[in-house]
């Protein structure tokens, strides 16, 4: 069954790949307040990197996908998908301000019989909170929570391949969620809304904790001047029970830390494992700088180049990137910090060739593929990731 589907926040890293995927099966209307992104998407330009999305965007537009900054286009939609999560505030507690503001805007265009699908990660109980809010406003709108579980950069590919979790408070809400995703041809997993909310949070927190384990092991080994990557290889080689151990590196981005803190808040801040993971992962940049100061006591006389400012490899997304935290710390203890990234738009970045020429030493901030073979003129490289294969001891 073909639906008319609205995607609020549809020009972002989560919303646009979803809109493109759904446009092959439904009539899709994107709404976004980012006027620059709206203009670019209308022209058929992806505002960010995502594998296979450039051509697919063109196909979606040719199918009639609407891209607008006007919520009025949502009035005739059967399903309205919201790509807005619950952020954390300055105290690392969940903030509902964005959601409340959105509902104040949407209630003017929502109508009885529609289904509102929450797609982004939310604090547990948010779906029910939204449903109750709509009921208080007299809107008989179904609410479903169907979390995204994609990795940035390959979102479109994963939407077409991964099982979709669907949940709702009524049979009608669940049926609408199923009708939305069934044409993708993937498996549908039905849960209750709170179960679905926790599934997404547990998944992200599990990953964050795993990264913390690897980073803690790396720091322990480094204190004894041992290359943890040699140990990691021995742990994982032909040994299935350690196969899932990640490599060390900056665990960052818009989700993992935020969701770990939301999980803690949900459990009355009794989440010591999550707090420990936060201390390890957020402390890695300071650990790296401390090791650099031991190796180069004259660091204040040196110019340091950071290669890669995105929060992960092959990405242009700098949200919560620990490379920027590293830059701030290094700026206090080194002569100068130069930063570069081939994918990131930032007026403070320096051309890669200039950084290679001017820097006395380098730190791999994001392990973009190009840095593996980049000629760094024999200068020292701090490489927690062991991206260049020369070891990670600082």
Language model: regions and residue ranges:
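Structural/interface elements that position substrates and couple domains in central-metabolism enzymes
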Residues: 1-394
